[in-house]
Amino acid sequence: MDWYKEPPMWTVDGSTITMRSGPKTDFWRTTHYGFIRDNVHFYYRHVADDFLVEVKVGGAYTALYDQAGLMVRVDEANWIKCGIEFVDGVQQVSAVVTREYSDWSVAPLPSNPAALWLRLTRHGSAIEIRYALDGVQYQMLRLAYFIPSETMSAGLMCASPDGAGFTVTFEGLTIQSK
């Protein structure tokens, strides 16, 4: 696996990957805020055709917009990130679909869970995002069109747009062809 914007601290211990995000890191393009950010920490590998990415993620979210989860990326203007994002003092399950402009959706999670399981699946030109609180009963968060591309990058991301950084743990990362 490779890094796009390696974080200040990261370790791998078996199937557990721990990272500490740097301050002022984010992926965002234009919508509402008028700025472009392209410096999130992204640990990825290249994938082709249809694929599935799964992981369990937990973090010490404290600052507004602290975020961690999964990401797929074709280039700086075409990407999707999903996971937990800390908004209004609450952990939210979050998805941002970007095709030149970012489109963000969130839903509050019950009682700031210690961890969240994420599953992102590519089916042709569609990306399906699901999440579970227990690792078993997955709910759909988003089904989105995504630009056709023979290959793209898929993996883990974390960022701290407003905060000084936070620590996040990913467990059991799976990236497989379908």
Model-inferred region functions:
Residues 1-178:
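Extracellular glycan-recognition regions
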